[in-house]
Amino acid sequence: MRELAQEQAPITINTYKEDIMNTDIKQAMHVEAAKSFSSAEANENERRWNDDKIDRKNQDSTNNYDKTRMKLNFEIGTDGKIHTLGYHEKSLEVRLQERLSELCWKPFKPDSKIQPNCCARFIFGGNHDRTIEMAFGDQTVNLEKDADNSHLLRCEEIEHWAKDVYDWCAKRYGQENIVGFQVHLDESSPHIHALIVTVGQRTKSGRECVMWSAKFGKNRYEYGQILREMHTSLYEEVGSKYGLERGDSIEGRNVQHLHKRDYIRKLTKDAKQAEKAVKGLQTMTRRLESQIFRSQSQLEEIEKSLASGKIALQEYEIQKTR
C-alpha cells in the first residue's frame, strides 16, 4: 500500500541565527520533505545560469551570488569523487525522476489534494567564520555584492568536509539514492545541498520502494527522535573533526516553518538586529569608559589636595569611597 503524504518537515532557524551572532561554532543541518523537484530548483543547485540570469537573481536584496567565486563550486558525483559543479550531462530533476522510476514510484492523480513525499532536501553548513575558513583559509574574502574575489583558491579542507558529509549520507541512505550533492562557495556562507531519495522495503514483498517513513518516522514524535539522533551522529562522525559543535534539534524550541525566501529575509533581519545590538553595547562601553576616566581624574585631584595639605586625611577617605 502506498505511503500516504505527510506534512513537510520543517526547516529549523535556530542554528543559523546563532551563526550570524557568532556565539557558537556549530554545525547546521536542515531537512525538508519534498513531493517534487522543479527544473528551476535544479538549475539553481547546479548553477545552470548565464550572466543575465545571475544579474536578475541578484536584484533581489536577499540574494548574493558571486560570479567571481562560482568557479570554486563543486559537487560529489555518484562515484564519490569531486567534480566541477554541473558536470552531469543530465540535469538534477531528470536524474531524480530516473531514480524514482527505478523504484516504480508513482504520484497520486494530478487532481489529488495530497501527494506522497518522494525525496528529502538537505542543507548542511555551519558557523559562518569557520566554514569560510575551511573554504578559503586565510585568504581575504569580500562578501559585498559585486565584489571581485577572482583571486581566491579553494582549500582542501572544505573538500574533505564535504566528502565526509557525503559518506555520512551514503551510509544512512545508500549512495545510489544520493541524486545530487552540490557544494556552494559563491554565497555568504559555504554550504551543501543534498537531494536524496528515501527508500524502504515493502512488508510483504520485501521490494525496495520510495518510503519517507522508513527514514524519518511515521509521526512527529518519531521524526523528532530521528532528527536528534541525526544531529548527534553528524557531530560525532563529521562535525567534531572540523571543530564544529553539535547542532540544535527541534526539541523544546519554537520552530518556525519558513520557505527559503522568508527564511533568508528573517536571517537578514536578525543580522541587522544583531548589528544594532552591537552598536548599543559599543555606546554603553564608551559611556562607562568616560565615567571611569572622570572618576579617575577626580581621585587624582583629591590625592593632589591631600599631598598639599589642603584636605585632612579623614575627609580624603570619605571622598575616595564615594
State the predicted function of each range:
Residues M1-R322:
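N-terminal nicking endonuclease/strand-transfer module with a His-rich metal-binding environment
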